[in-house]
């Protein structure tokens, strides 16, 4: 963005586009750490921030991915299929919530393929860690890829930002179908306990591309927290079948 530079980058457990929630708070236990660039790494700059419960993050899309480049966009962690990527904006888009079939205007969506690649996310503030190298802001519920550049941070102010009479447009007529997740205990034991809740929430949202074919025998791979999570999907049932260390 012309005349602007990142003040920080967020570090999350999702290194690829595949698996990133389509909106914040769909996976409310997803952990994120915002680490400032040296020029902005001042403990004084975040004084008073910990009195707020939620924050707004302004960030940048890169080639349609929160913090990624075209080579990072993958259908799953194994294939690195980059089909469907596009560095240009589109006047109309196919929202996943509509099954990837119907088109609506880009400005009536939060599609990444916009004239200006700006993203806006609301997150829950977990805590602010003050270090000798500057503050680290720990947040929950971010829908951002690991390494996404952050351009600004603002407090969420309830009386100004919360509108009880707000309506959701076409989204209200397109409820999202969550998946039932079967995660054998033996495989759960291979995931750090603090990462389990966020992982299950990501899987429940169905990481697959909208309109994916019914392929109950296909094994998908999700890169998460340094792990390769293998799973299958049959109708509305997602089953985790393996957990391994992620391959570089």
Task: List where the protein language model places each region.
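Glycine-rich, low-complexity intrinsically disordered segments
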Residues: 1-122, 126-248
């Amino acid at each position: 963005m012309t005349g602007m530079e990142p003040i920080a980058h967020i570090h999350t457990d999702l290194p690829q586009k595949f698996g990133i929630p389509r909106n914040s708070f769909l996976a409310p236990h997803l952990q994120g750490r915002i680490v400032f660039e040296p020029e902005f790494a001042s403990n004084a700059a975040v004084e008073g921030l910990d009195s707020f419960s939620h924050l707004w993050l302004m960030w940048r899309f890169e080639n349609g991915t929160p913090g990624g480049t075209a080579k990072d966009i993958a259908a799953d962690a194994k294939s690195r299929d980059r089909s469907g990527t596009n560095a240009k904006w589109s006047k109309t888009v196919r929202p996943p919530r509509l099954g990837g079939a119907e088109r609506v205007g880009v400005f009536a969506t939060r599609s990444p393929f916009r004239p200006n690649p700006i993203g806006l996310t609301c997150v829950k503030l977990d805590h602010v860690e003050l270090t000798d190298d500057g503050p680290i802001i720990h947040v929950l519920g971010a829908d951002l890829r690991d390494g996404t550049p952050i351009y600004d941070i603002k407090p969420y102010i309830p009386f100004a930002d919360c509108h009880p009479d707000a309506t959701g447009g076409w989204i209200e007529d397109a409820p999202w179908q969550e998946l039932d997740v079967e995660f054998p205990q033996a495989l759960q034991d291979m995931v750090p306990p603090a990462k389990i809740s966020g992982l299950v929430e990501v899987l429940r949202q169905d990481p697959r591309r909208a309109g994916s074919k019914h392929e109950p025998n296909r094994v998908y791979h999700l890169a998460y927290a340094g792990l390769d999570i293998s799973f299958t999907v049959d109708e509305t049932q997602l089953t985790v079948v393996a957990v391994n260390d992620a391959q570089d």
